[in-house]
Amino acid sequence: MVSASRPEALAAPVTTVATLVPHNATEPASPGEGKEDAFSKLKQKFMNELHKIPLPPWALIAIAIVAVLLVVTCCFCVCKKCLFKKKNKKKGKEKGGKNAINMKDVKDLGKTMKDQALKDDDAETGLTDGEEKEEPKEEEKLGKLQYSLDYDFQNNQLLVGIIQAAELPALDMGGTSDPYVKVFLLPDKKKKFETKVHRKTLNPVFNEQFTFKVPYSELGGKTLVMAVYDFDRFSKHDIIGEFKVPMNTVDFGHVTEEWRDLQSAEKEEQEKLGDICFSLRYVPTAGKLTVVILEAKNLKKMDVGGLSDPYVKIHLMQNGKRLKKKKTTIKKNTLNPYYNESFSFEVPFEQIQKVQVVVTVLDYDKIGKNDAIGKVFVGYNSTGAELRHWSDMLANPRRPIAQWHTLQVEEEVDAMLAVKK
């Protein structure tokens, strides 16, 4: 009995052990439990490291928040930039397509509109294709001039008053003009008067009077010309406009005063003599007047070969008397001579406003008399551009003032000098 029950008692524990061991050793853990263990370990490790950092907890939390914000901001910027690029590409494609269509059709559209406009014009005017269309020309407004006329029967003198001008056109770059007026009688034109130049104005007030010695019996056959010019120091003066008054249409029983509109000037048939450029300089303390003959251009052809041999004479005059005379060298075979020659005259300050400088351009001739090409004078009783040059010299002592002058017929200048003795 004892032997039989003992094996059974021994076997039971074996079976029990066999069933318990596998249950304790091989039962698998659930996925949630594994992740929780890993997170717990990581958290525990992080907290251990965090406690090692020598900062208070609130500082660590602030750093963490800033880091998170930076990461979020960077992500937002990257996403926005990507979206913006996509939109631009899309718009560019749409815009390119539209432009291509417009560029393709623009010529046809322009032709169509042009043809339509021509048809509309023809319909309005009633003209056919074979008829020529003439556009009406608007009259150019040149301004107007106020003047007065009177005759002194006792002294046989025609008195011409240049009062003022208005609404003149702007011929200079700055939107203004430098106007002055020329007055002369036709047909002789020997005696010309000029008003003073008024700078930078379109409405100059002159109030100047000029006297022509003309017998009344001859006055009816003459025509008075009043021409308004724009002064230019370094080039030819531009004519703004003019008008003519036949003397046989004027009633000299009373003083005539009226406004007249300026008309386009007729082309002058007078032969051009050329232009000369010279500078003036006056030193009051030394009483020294310096004239520098610089150059001349477009001189009249005097020789058979179509050229000239020009030189220049300078006379210092007072009361019709020649005080001193100078002359330049001769330039052979040219109509545009260059001199750059200086001449000095002693003129005391109290005499400077009483003298005249007469400049004459002549053509040298080995055989015979040297012919005068043209002449001009500045100084006492000069007018227009010549008076302006002299005034500028006096207003700027010690400074050379250069200016171009148009040469005039010698006889006309001599007549003016003779009258103004």
Swiss-Prot record:
CDD domains: C2A_Synaptotagmin-1-5-6-9-10, C2B_Synaptotagmin-1, Syt1_N. A lipid is attached at residues 74-75, 77, 79, 82 (S-palmitoyl cysteine). Ca(2+) 5 binds at residues 303, 363, 365, 371. The modification Phosphoserine is found at residues 264, 342, 344. Residues 121-133 have a biased composition (Acidic residues). It holds the Pfam family C2. One of its GO terms (molecular function) is SNARE binding. Residues 135-381 are annotated as: Phospholipid binding. The chain crosses the membrane at residues 58-79. Ca(2+) 4 binds at residues 303, 309, 363, 365. One of its GO terms (cellular component) is presynaptic cytosol. Changing residue 236 to Q: No effect on calcium-dependent neurotransmitter release. GO terms for biological process: calcium ion-regulated exocytosis of neurotransmitter; calcium-dependent activation of synaptic vesicle fusion; cell differentiation; cellular response to calcium ion; detection of calcium ion; fast, calcium ion-dependent exocytosis of neurotransmitter; membraneless organelle assembly; neurotransmitter secretion. Ca(2+) 2 binds at residues 171-172, 230, 232, 238. Its main location: membrane. It is a single-pass membrane protein. Disulfide bonds: none annotated. Keywords: Calcium, Cytoplasm, Cytoplasmic vesicle, Differentiation, Glycoprotein, Lipoprotein, Membrane, Metal-binding, Palmitate, Phosphoprotein, Repeat, Synapse, Transmembrane, Transmembrane helix. Residues 112-141 are annotated as: Disordered. This is Synaptotagmin-1. It comes from Mus musculus. The gene is Syt1.
